[in-house]
Amino acid sequence: IFPIEERDVPQGAVEGDYVTKTQPFPSKPAPLTKTYLDPEDVFGFTPWDKGYCKKAAEDYRNEGLYTPPSIEGSVHYPSAIGGANWGGPAIDASRNILIANTMNLASTIVMVPRSDCDKALKDLARDSVQSRFSALQQNEGTPYCTIRAFGFMSPLGVPCTKPPWGSLTAIDLDTGDHLWQIPLGTSKDLAPFPFWWIKGAPNIGGPTVTASGLTFIAATSDYYLRAFNTSFFVSSLISTKGNLTVGLHIPKSDAAYLTGEGLLAINIAL
């Protein structure tokens, strides 16, 4: 158990709402992803879309973790599609190591007064990019509807956050230190050539660990199942697709099998 400290967080909620002055932060482990989108550190394949991302990051409320939703629009980073997400972590109890896959993705949210909520999204959005990559949520019975982005995207549909967009991290639960952190996946099956060079792709499913010290994870948008040494980063690839958390099936025989979406049963040695 590591100490928790209260830190000041951004203030200024919309009318009718409130935020607390402080939030609890653990002293360890260190954050798995970045928590602030620096306008000087945005990403783009071209100067045009990078410039768009920079200006948008400057125009929105963008004060890091716990930036309140606002009428002018706020950056959420990590977002509902970022950080340690749907797949969840895995724990190697014999080695006291936690393995977590994460997404380094931001999103935006705009609070719209109820009087304007009958308008179309294209009329409420700041531009066509926000309209393409957002949804209008009505939030019936509240003073606001919201324009919630699926991701903070450039005009080319590329995340404004710098790669890696996906990572895998091992944490020593005794010390709270990161043992290793590596980009997870590539853009090979996500983007056209020549943009396969990006390391660290969006990912969904979580990792699975074995008692023998192996970590297996599919999860990524490229078609590989990856195997790692849990204690220190050594990897290998199996060419197959799977976006869900890999299952480990141990029948009465001595064999063990990996199973999951897109996977045949793969025999492994524990």
Region spans (language model):
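Substrate-gating cap/lid region and adjacent catalytic-acid/histidine neighborhood
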Residues: 92, 96-98, 106, 116-119
